[in-house]
Amino acid sequence: VYPLLAIDEVYRRAARAQEIGAGYFCIVTSGRRIGEPKEFERICRMVSKIRSDLQIEVDASLGELSLHQAEALKGNGLRRYNHNVEAARSLFPGICSTHNYEDRLRTIENVKAAGLELCCGGIIGMGESVDQRAEFLFDLRELEPHCIPI
């Protein structure tokens, strides 16, 4: 686990991204979720500062979110949230032992309920069958993400 960067450092990086032509800037953390309320508040301030001062859109991938957290991010100017389902539901228990597929879906529901765009995909090539690849794609279709990273 890495410490969260300072607001000014993230802002400088977003400004640089905009300067070289990026239209989007994504704030990403490691771990299952943001553990400390103060860290979450700091991320909200990052989003707000970038959106108020720059012309770049802000996205994030921070792990599991409650509805309240998703709404707070949206209220501070976040556009899109990335939360991958990773694989077909039937394969998921074999690739992840820290949480279940329903935990992933709960965050996705919260993201959509807050009015954020959803970025949701997964990884191909983890030993899944052709049927599991199809299952994964059909599951993604039902989630209606704005973009799908594979």
Regions from the PLM with identified roles:
Residues 2-12, 34-80, 85-89, 103, ...:
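Canonical radical SAM enzyme core domain
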Residues 27-29, 52-53, 80, 102-150:
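Conserved C-terminal portion of the radical SAM core fold
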Residues 2-4, 94-99:
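Short glycine-enriched, charge-decorated loop/helix-capping segments at active-site entrances
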Residues 16-20, 86, 107-114:
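Short alpha-helical scaffold segments that flank and stabilize functional sites
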Residues 9-29:
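Short Fe-S-cluster ligation motifs
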